[in-house]
Curated annotation (Swiss-Prot):
Keywords in alphabetical order: G-protein coupled receptor, Membrane, Pheromone response, Receptor, Transducer, Transmembrane, Transmembrane helix
Species this chain originates from: Ustilago hordei (Barley covered smut fungus)
Function according to Swiss-Prot or TrEMBL: Receptor for the A2 pheromone, a prenylated mating factor.
Superkingdom of the organism of origin: Eukaryota
Protein name: Pheromone receptor 1
Biased composition (Polar residues): 348-359
A GO cellular component entry from the record: plasma membrane
Any GO BP: pheromone-dependent signal transduction involved in conjugation with cellular fusion
Gene that this sequence comes from: PRA1
């Protein structure tokens, strides 16, 4: 039997990962925004699948499964693609290749980031049908699961893109760290010259995030698919019709059947843990900073006021300052009354208008 703790572990991670999303949206950091959303939907899907198929393998939600398996498949490359966008940005800033850009250049940069972090997963999912042997399958305690034919085409369209994107992200991460280390003494000036919304502390947190992806998740993925690649790369792709024979059939597996396949069970458990662990790391990087804590405090105070458990703080009333201003007027030396003209003052509070007498 698979564990019953992971689904709730995923639900809590799903909530935590949204805490720092507001700051990422304000900073317009495409990589961290898409990574937050992917981790949110990945953990939510994990929780819903596990709860809906807690003790059954019945085909009871075909529409949901169609969406769920595509989301699961997309996440294989979506998370590394978002990390690649983050690593590219960090390397560009630290190498001083990113300077104050015009509006058109900034727009172009955002489009490129979106093509990598969103366009690439969409293309990846659209090619899923080439190797898809069934609409989906159902595994008790796991939920909907994609079933793919293993061949050299699977290596080309499924395994290789993830490895390439992950490797590119690792290269950019190393380069970003190298430039950061070279320019560490004047790095605040480097950030200022790049017109970046990042400060040094946030830059370091992003750098640590990409390093964790490079040192932890990339080796795990390589290790989990290496044996499969060795077996699949020598297997021919017979034909489209052969692969899709019986496409509408929905295979259903009980938890007891999974117990008899330890290698597949290990991959299942690993796949269920990647999103929650990634979300907790993401929260540790961005959900515990000073700006995040201030945001939590503000949100809690707002909630207490809304629930009428705390009075809303009144803004201090500004006291009006009464100024005793004098207006100086001048009289001519030769006046009809023979009065020796000399400057005299009138109180500002007197409503008599100031006049200049004719000479």
């Amino acid at each position: 039997m698979l564990d019953h703790v992971t689904p709730f572990f995923a639900l809590f991670a799903c909530i935590l990962v949204l805490f720092a999303l507001g700051w990422h949206i304000r900073s317009r950091n495409v990589g961290t925004i898409t990574l937050s959303l992917y981790l949110f939907f990945g953990n939510l899907d994990n929780f819903v699948n596990s709860v809906a198929w807690w003790s059954t393998a019945e085909d009871k939600a075909p529409g949901f499964c169609e969406v769920s398996i595509r989301l699961r498949h997309a996440l294989y490359i979506a998370i590394p693609a978002s990390n690649l966008v983050i690593a590219r940005k960090l390397e560009s800033i630290a190498s001083t290749r990113q300077v104050r850009a015009s509006a058109s250049e900034h727009k172009k940069s955002i489009i490129i980031d979106l093509l990598i972090s969103v366009g690439l997963p969409v293309l990846y999912v659209s090619l899923m049908i080439v190797n898809q042997t069934n609409r989906y399958g159902i595994i008790e305690q796991v939920g909907c699961w994609p079933f793919l034919s293993l061949s050299w085409v699977w290596v080309l369209l499924v395994a290789a893109p993830v490895l390439i994107v992950s490797f590119a992200s690792a290269v950019y991460s190393v380069l970003a760290f190298r430039w950061f280390w070279i320019r560490r003494r004047q790095f605040q000036a480097v950030l200022a010259s790049s017109a970046s919304t990042l400060n040094k502390a946030r830059y370091i947190r992003l750098l640590v995030l990409t390093a964790i992806d490079m040192l932890l998740f990339f080796p795990i993925y390589v290790g989990s698919v290496s044996d499969t690649i060795r077996g699949a790369i020598t297997t021919s792709y017979v034909s489209w019709s052969y692969v899709h024979t019986g496409f509408s059939y929905i295979p259903q597996f009980s938890a007891e059947v999974m117990e008899m396949q330890p290698s597949f069970k290990a991959r299942l458990i690993l796949s269920r843990l990647v999103c929650p662990i990634s979300a907790y790391i993401f929260f540790a990087m961005f959900g515990l900073g000073q700006e995040a804590r201030q945001g939590y405090k503000h949100a809690v105070l707002k909630a207490l006021v809304f629930c009428k458990l705390r009075k809303e703080r009144q803004k201090p009333i500004q006291n009006h300052i009464v100024a005793n201003i004098e207006v100086v007027t001048f009289q001519s030396r030769e006046t009809s009354g023979g009065i020796d003209g000399s400057p005299h003052s009138e109180k500002f509070s007197i409503n008599t208008p100031t006049k200049y007498e004719e000479a």
